[in-house]
């Protein structure tokens, strides 16, 4: 039997100012649009904006 798709998917988030990426999960139902979060970038050593990529 095939199981149905869950609501949580794994996404990549890329820094807008460097090449650093984070991987995280998001709920499709609660966040149907692309995420934008301020996270710590270790290459720049400061918080920058991260955007969800495909």
Swiss-Prot record:
Q: Pfam families, from UniProt?
A: Ribosomal_L33 (PF00471)
Keywords per UniProt: Ribonucleoprotein, Ribosomal protein
Q: Which Gene Ontology MF annotations are present? A: structural constituent of ribosome
Q: Which GO terms describe its cellular component?
A: cytosolic large ribosomal subunit
InterPro entries from the UniProt entry: Ribosomal_bL33, Ribosomal_bL33_sf, Ribosomal_zn-bd
Which Gene Ontology biological process is one annotated for this entry?
translation
PANTHER family, from UniProt? 54S RIBOSOMAL PROTEIN L39, MITOCHONDRIAL, LARGE RIBOSOMAL SUBUNIT PROTEIN BL33M
The entry assigns this protein to a family as follows: Belongs to the bacterial ribosomal protein bL33 family.
Protein name, per record: Large ribosomal subunit protein bL33
């Amino acid at each position: 039997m095939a199981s149905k798709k869950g609501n949580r998917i794994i996404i990549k988030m890329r820094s807008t100012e460097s090449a650093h990426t984070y991987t995280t999960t998001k709920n499709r139902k609660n966040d149907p649009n692309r995420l934008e979060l301020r996270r710590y970038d270790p290459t720049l050593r400061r918080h920058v904006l991260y955007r969800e990529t495909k």
